[in-house]
């Protein structure tokens, strides 16, 4: 193993003769907490843990899983007793929120950490760099894809028009009213630049154009309403409902999160097909890419903190990143120097394609934003989308309600 390991073994200052425990908390995305067991037991962690154990044979890494919705309460209570975890694996907005609340520490920019940071794409680093410091160290990326039943469809539709034709032919497709699950359609229908500030609470210095944004939102919502009215379009509340519908054969096509692929591989086998999401009349889709980061616990001893930093840095080692990518085929490496073997893996080629679509979308989604903001706004957005899709609100009324959520000009998150 090359790259980071010499720095770890030479400079960490941790005694290898002392038996210690490193408590690592894994936090699944709130929308996929029903995959909690898969999240803890997946093979992704084994290459990292095996290599860490070779360097620190007397350190026991204790893995536990906590729900995202209860994380603030868990950490607040643990901190009051000085028993918080040493390391947390969370989404980048969650790390930003925890740092703002003082529940995690900023990543110290030591020489070894700066070496690790140099391995990252600047756009990924920008998602965790805040006024209080770096909220977390990126380790891998999860994407939004299209999953389909290969016994029902010979290939995935590449356009929304083709997707609607699938439904018209008698095959049922699934859509989600959950905002992140339907975010891909904002790009396809030309509304992602209008929706970006609403989601992240930051206009990124973009000069507001209210008439243009209102028109874009109306068009998007009208298009979603038209899709919902079509026969054989099943509107679900979230990824669990859609995933189970695909597994059972009731649905032929759904938008899906890459983190669900391990389960779908197990339940569907060769019936599972994976593709990038379809384009629309306004251009490419806007799939969301979730950046997973290590956040540093606030209650560690100096020795435990050095171990936590060592594990974080080791996770970016090229060989570890490559092993994680190849063993799961559902995440992409954060280390920009790791070549993803897209030529030999159709699954990884799809993931890389979805990541390119995300990077070509609005730059606002690559800014640091807080999970607290998202948790306040997304239920309102979901309610508006749901009411428009079932006809309770008109597209015009829905657009006006969404615009009420936008930040003031020049506002931060």
Regions found by a protein language model. Give the residues of each.
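Ligand-binding "clamshell"
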Residues: 98-106, 131-133, 192, 264-282, ...
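Glycine-centered hinge/linker elements that transmit conformational signals in sensory
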Residues: 202-236
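Paired acidic/hydrophobic, glycine-rich loop segments that form the ligand-binding mouth/hinge
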Residues: 86-89, 252-257, 273
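Hinge/lid segment of periplasmic solute-binding proteins
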Residues: 92-145, 155, 273-275
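Long, aromatic- and glycine/proline-rich binding clefts that accommodate carbohydrate-like moieties
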Residues: 326-379, 387
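Extracytoplasmic/periplasmic solute-binding protein
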Residues: 135-139, 144, 162-209, 251
């Amino acid at each position: 193993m090359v790259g980071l390991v010499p720095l770890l073994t030479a400079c960490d200052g941790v005694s290898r003769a002392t038996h210690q425990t490193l408590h690592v908390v894994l936090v699944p995305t709130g929308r996929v907490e029903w995959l909690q067991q898969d999240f803890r037991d997946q093979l992704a962690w084994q290459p990292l843990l095996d290599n860490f154990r070779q360097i620190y044979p007397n350190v026991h890494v204790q893995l536990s899983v906590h729900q995202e919705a209860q994380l603030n309460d868990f950490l607040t209570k643990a901190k009051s007793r000085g028993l918080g975890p040493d390391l947390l694996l969370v989404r980048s907005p969650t790390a930003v929120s925890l740092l703002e609340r003082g529940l995690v520490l900023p990543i110290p920019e030591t020489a070894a950490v700066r070496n690790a940071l140099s391995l990252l794409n600047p756009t990924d680093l920008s998602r965790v760099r805040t006024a209080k410091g770096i909220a977390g160290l990126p380790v891998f990326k999860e994407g939004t894809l299209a999953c389909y039943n290969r016994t029902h469809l010979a290939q995935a539709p590449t356009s929304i028009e083709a997707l609607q034709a699938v439904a018209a032919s008698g095959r049922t497709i699934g859509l989600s009213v959950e905002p992140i699950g339907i975010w891909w359609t904002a790009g396809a229908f030309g509304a992602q630049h209008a929706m970006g500030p609403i989601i992240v609470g930051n206009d990124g210095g973009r000069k507001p154009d209210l008439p243009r944004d209102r028109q874009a939102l109306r068009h998007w919502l009208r298009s979603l309403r038209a899709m919902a009215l079509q026969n054989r379009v099943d509107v679900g509340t979230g990824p669990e409902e859609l995933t189970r519908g695909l597994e059972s054969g009731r649905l032929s096509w759904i938008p899906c999160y890459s983190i669900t692929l391990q389960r779908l591989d197990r339940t569907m086998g060769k019936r599972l097909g994976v593709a990038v999401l379809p384009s629309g009349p306004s251009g490419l889709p806007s799939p969301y890419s979730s950046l997973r980061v290590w956040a540093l616990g606030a209650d560690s001893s100096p020795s435990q903190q050095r171990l936590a930093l060592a594990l974080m840095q080791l996770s970016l080692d090229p060989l570890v990143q490559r092993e994680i990518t190849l063993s799961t085929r559902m995440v992409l490496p954060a280390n920009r120097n790791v070549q993803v073997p897209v030529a030999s893996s159709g699954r990884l080629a799809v993931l890389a394609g979805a990541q390119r679509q995300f990077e070509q979308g609005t730059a606002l989604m690559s800014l640091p934003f807080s999970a607290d903001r998202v948790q306040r706004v997304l239920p309102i957005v979901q309610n508006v989308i749901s009411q428009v899709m079932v006809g309770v609100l008109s597209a015009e009324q829905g657009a006006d309600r969404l615009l009420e959520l936008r930040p003031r000009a020049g506002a931060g998150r």
